[in-house]
Each structure stands twice: as structure tokens, then as C-alpha cells.
């Protein structure tokens, strides 16, 4: 697998693929992703970090923006508390094997020049466009705050300030990234990853909703959470267990089953697994048991490093 294919695998889209191929030719290139510091780093975060590791392996310098001011604007707590959580997040990302430069937003977002450029960008952005870009990110929908229109403009400015070639995020970041491509003099390549479905099957996996598997969960916690997770027979779309099987598990995969239910099953690819499950040749509980045990193995090195 070449560098381009390695970066492209398991992404939802790259804007644009041609521009990424040009960036890959550069001797020095950089990519960034921003995270609002979170009390629990879960599989949704891990999926993003896995992509940053792909970029790292393709020769990119990696920048992780610990977006403390963004978290503050999104009503995630007081700044001191958010900063402490960010310090913990850094340790978790390092335990995942990522080698990166870590930057707190508050280290540069309060500078005079940064603030002045936010004002310049604000003059070019309609209120409707700024609000629309926050639809999948904002914490509160019914009574939106002015902070919600400052947030995306700051994120656009972050891309400019950091001077990166590639911006990475989940699909919920797409509208902000498109705004950046329109407003900034340098068109950044945008890599968008899937947004994992929460274990309850309702919306995205989120620490605030409690519908997640944390990367430092114990084996017992992982088994219990997966056992209770939404996983209707034959349904692939919006099935969190199938998503975990697609984005985290390695193949061939052995699914252990009692002899009376057909005995152990070897699955050579995710596509084969999807076909078996869709055709109801694989029971949800057998799938859950296999996914739980494989996930425990995958997360064990991270737990040990922490």
C-alpha cells in the first residue's frame, strides 16, 4: 500500500485527492487536528488518532491542537479545569503511539495579531454561514450563544496560524473546513473521517452522552458495554458494533461459537463479515463476543502505558 492509499483508507472523503498527491511530493509537510479536551478519550477520538498516525508514517509533521478556548466557548467548563484535562489527553494520545507537537489554543489565540485576523474573517462570513457550520458541533441547540459564531471563525484562523498543509477531522467538521478553503489564501487539504455511532445507536459516540467505549476501559467494562450495545440482526447501517469491526479489527478474524451454532468461524475480511451479518448467518451475540475480545487486545497496550 502506497502512502496515498494508506492515508485514504477508512476516510469518508479527501478534499481534494489531487491536492493531497501534490502535498505528498513535498519534503516538509504538516497536518493537524484539533480536539476539545475531553475527560474520556473514546473510540471516536482513537479513529482520528489512527489517521494522524497514518499521516505521521507518510512523513507528515503532526500538530495536535488542544483546543481549550474552543472547549470553553462550547461550554465544557472553566479554563483551568479544561487545561488539566488536556494534559491527560496528551498522555493518552502518546500512549496510542502518536508522535506530535502539542499546542494549546490559549498559547496563541489571545495574541493581538490572531484576534485582528479573527475580525477580518468575521467581516467575510455571514451569520447564517457561521451558525450552519456549528450544527453538528454545538453543545446547545435551543438557545444558541454568540460564542457559537466565534468558534468556527477561530477554527478557520487556527488553520491559517498553524500554516498546515492538511486539516483532519470528523465529518462534523466539514462545513468549517469548507469555510477555511474559501476564506484563506492557502487552500488546505481536508481529510474527513467517519463519525462513529454511539453504542446506543442514537447519534455519534460522545463522552457527554455516555454511549462510548473509552480507550482505558477495563476488559470487564468493554464486555459489558458491548453486550448492551445496539446491534439488531441483519442491520449494518448505524450499527456501532459493525463500525468497530470495520475500523478497528484486523482480519482474518476468528469468531468463536459453540458447535451447536456452527462452531468457530474464520472471516477473512470486513466485507465478508458484513455479508454474513447482513444475511443473518452470524448472530449478533457471536459478533459482539468476538468484537469485545479483539477490542480488549487492541486497547491493552494503551491501558498498560497509561
Swiss-Prot record:
A motif ('HIGH' region) lies at residues 37-45. The record marks 143 as: Interaction with t-RNA. Its main location: cytoplasm. The keyword Electron transport does not apply. One of its GO terms (biological process) is tyrosyl-tRNA aminoacylation. Changing residue 158 to A: Confers specificity for the non-natural amino acid O-methyl-tyrosine. ATP binds at residue 207. It catalyses: tRNA(Tyr) + L-tyrosine + ATP = L-tyrosyl-tRNA(Tyr) + AMP + diphosphate + H(+). A motif ('KMSKS' region) lies at residues 204-208. It comes from the Archaea. Keywords: Aminoacyl-tRNA synthetase, ATP-binding, Cytoplasm, Ligase, Nucleotide-binding, Protein biosynthesis. One of its GO terms (cellular component) is cytoplasm. L-tyrosine binds at residues 32, 36, 173. It is found in: Cytoplasm. Pfam families: tRNA-synt_1b. Signal peptide: none annotated. PANTHER family: TYROSINE--TRNA LIGASE, CYTOPLASMIC (PTHR46264:SF4), TYROSINE-TRNA LIGASE (PTHR46264). Catalyzes the attachment of tyrosine to tRNA(Tyr) in a two-step reaction: tyrosine is first activated by ATP to form Tyr-AMP and then transferred to the acceptor end of tRNA(Tyr). Belongs to the class-I aminoacyl-tRNA synthetase family. TyrS type 3 subfamily. This is Tyrosine--tRNA ligase. It comes from Methanocaldococcus jannaschii (strain ATCC 43067 / DSM 2661 / JAL-1 / JCM 10045 / NBRC 100440). The lineage of its organism: Archaea, Methanobacteriati, Methanobacteriota, Methanomada group, Methanococci.
Amino acid at each position: 500500500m502506497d502512502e496515498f492509499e494508506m492515508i485514504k483508507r477508512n476516510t469518508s472523503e479527501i478534499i481534494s485527492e489531487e491536492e493531497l498527491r501534490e502535498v505528498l511530493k513535498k519534503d516538509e509537510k504538516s497536518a493537524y487536528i484539533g480536539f476539545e479536551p475531553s475527560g474520556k478519550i473514546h473510540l471516536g477520538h482513537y479513529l482520528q488518532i489512527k489517521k494522524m498516525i497514518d499521516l505521521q508514517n507518510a512523513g507528515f509533521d503532526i500538530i495536535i491542537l488542544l483546543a481549550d478556548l474552543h472547549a470553553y466557548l462550547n461550554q465544557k467548563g472553566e479554563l483551568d479545569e479544561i487545561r488539566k484535562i488536556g494534559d491527560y489527553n496528551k498522555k493518552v494520545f502518546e500512549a496510542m503511539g502518536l508522535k506530535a507537537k502539542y499546542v494549546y489554543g490559549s498559547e496563541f489565540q489571545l495574541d493581538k495579531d490572531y484576534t485582528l485576523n479573527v475580525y477580518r474573517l468575521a467581516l467575510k462570513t455571514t451569520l447564517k454561514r457561521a451558525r450552519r457550520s456549528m450544527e453538528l458541533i454545538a453543545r446547545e441547540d435551543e438557545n444558541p450563544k454568540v460564542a457559537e459564531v466565534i468558534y468556527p471563525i477561530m477554527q478557520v484562523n487556527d488553520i491559517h496560524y498553524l500554516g498546515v498543509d492538511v486539516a483532519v477531522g470528523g465529518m462534523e467538521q466539514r462545513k468549517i473546513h469548507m469555510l477555511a478553503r474559501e476564506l484563506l489564501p492557502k487552500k488546505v487539504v481536508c481529510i474527513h473521517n467517519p463519525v462513529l455511532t454511539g453504542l446506543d445507536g442514537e447519534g455519534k459516540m460522545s463522552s457527554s452522552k455516555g454511549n462510548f467505549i473509552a480507550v482505558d476501559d477495563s476488559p470487564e467494562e468493554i464486555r459489558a458495554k458491548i453486550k448492551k450495545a445496539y446491534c439488531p440482526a441483519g442491520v449494518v447501517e448505524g450499527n456501532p458494533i459493525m463500525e468497530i469491526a470495520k475500523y478497528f479489527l484486523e482480519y482474518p478474524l476468528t469468531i468463536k461459537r459453540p458447535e451447536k451454532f456452527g462452531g468457530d468461524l474464520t472471516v477473512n475480511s470486513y466485507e465478508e463479515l458484513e455479508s454474513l451479518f447482513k444475511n443473518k448467518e452470524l448472530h449478533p451475540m457471536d459478533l459482539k463476543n468476538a468484537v469485545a475480545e479483539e477490542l480488549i487486545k487492541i486497547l491493552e497496550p494503551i491501558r498498560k502505558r497509561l
